[in-house]
């Protein structure tokens, strides 16, 4: 049963692995083994099985088998079953037979062995999320708290904490019980600390929390031992953070302890609590912030001072604190010049946040003192190249980049200061180059980087053995050259020094340099590097991918040299690269549902390459339409025909029709980029911005042609929006063609001497616009990295898809309805980067369509232009990455139908992503003879 239902989730990764049924059978054999070692090995492999096959039927069967082992096995096996339950918490709600699972585990509570009972209590606590309101379990936990065995009591405390987090009724019922145990004089300090930690979850809401807080505060005086006080502080802080309304009182209490308690560990615990409550900075009273500054000033312990600064670091993320941070700013200004570089770095970070906020809100502020402090910190960290100084250096460099972003006048000074420190080696050199690259990636790169150019060239002549440092060095040079190319024409002579510097480095370093060159539109340099890399590729897939990148980069380089004349050849090269890029990424076998080319299967680089090929082909059509005015002059009757048709552009003859067709092709290219952006769920923000910019640019070009060939030539609605303003140097490069087209359009249509219709002046403007569009745009990061942007999702459809011939179609009487059941799994993907979190799947939109087949004898049927007779849409919420849906399908006419099911993701912001995958089955609807109303002869007895 399991194998039949789960085999449709076939994995196309190419890794020879077992299916779910075989894997479960193998683990079951291990569980039934008479050797404890084999049983343990089988038990610990279950979490991996759940991650790979997170299907309810498998998980339910597995947990029932584990419950049997827990009931019949020894304590050692029970311990490993407990670990499996703790590690597989997100899959627990897929257990279907909860009662049977609970019965098998609960039976161990009747054992005479207190360790077995303790393990049972901990196991019940681990699965509290699926049995939160079971009264028999609540009673067992209460009975465990009254036990005379310490192990069982500790297990009951753990179970209490777990159940209280899921059941408010249980939390309220157990609050008095735990309070009595805490106040009991016979309770030991260690046990009391555990009970106090349990009180964090049993407060039962803001109203009930008042009594718990009162109890915990009384414990601070009644039981002054360090362990009890620290446990009470932790519990008080957690409850205040949960209820929010008690944050001001708790902040005052913690500050009082931090300033007056003589014990270092207690003061540290109070400061750690303040660090957690700093997330609610808007609720802090103003005098508490002043007291925090006073505590930091009076502290003689370096660790406590650092904790105070870290609390300030979180507080200043609130704009209200930044606006009224006079004393805080003064303290950080002094601390930023401290001899302790760690303190100075954190204080500088706090001060930078305040100053940047003032610049952004146009408040009066002077960043000169901060600039001096940051420069001094960078120089001070150079005195010792040890690893202890790298962290302060990175904080200072990050602050410099933020300050330059808020106030560009400091950019040149910062670049010069960083370039002066480039003589260092190792991690310090990487940090400095990374800061220069971050500085150059902004909009002020043209003004900032030339100041560092002499030092960068000197470093390039003596390149470091560190591959990452060399890549960063080349990236900074690419940024400087790219920013210069936006305003002037530059020669290619500088590329020789780059090639000489990377000639003898490893292939991975050269590949990263080539990717950076592609991002900043240095296509000829990237093509040279990629050509050599493709000849040295270690595998066939790598050779395909590198060859695809080489062809595409060479096509863009040729486009820069030849201009419009190279459009056709460049389009063909990009088309070839799109096929090779998909194969090189290891994709192309289709998704698990067996579709062909859905957005969930297609890798982002190959799809972007195909879109670029179609866009260049559309530009070639636009250029040909402009030339057609000269190569195919209008006939003599064209003017009369234009007057009769009331179409001024028709006077241009064939050129007008060609221009309109080119406009439609450009609009189609823009729609293709838009569809690509809507399917790239896991793409980084930079890649999505590039796709939106490409969509906007080709939409703008299409509107330009439509305006030329229209009758009124009125100004269309503006395409440029505030969301498409460049924020980085890469976006400036990508938006350069759009800005050029806008200038050409304004020059043409704002000129009063421009005659209406399609004249030679219009043709020259089209050629100029196409030439501007041919300028080599930078590549998106996701395309350079070969990253798949589609969402990883697998679908299984019941009834399962069958072979293509119509004879194998599922039969459906017209009077009946087909019950479709869809099950799917959202698969994890590798993280994009440390700086950008992954988008979360909050919902899955399921679209079911039924499309009739045309009556034809053809073996292959094209359903693109046939409207569906049924469209049903529903949105389901994934539970632990698993989702399921059901849909009834009915048709009203006999024949063959393709029933397609497509999934689309809904992210945390409510945006819909057309990620796929798409799966379908063919059904054959027929009339039921019993419903035709034909009377059948009654058979007689004789």
What are the roles of these predicted feature ranges?
Residues 1-842, 846-878, 885-916, 921-942:
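Extended, low-complexity, acidic/polar intrinsically disordered regions
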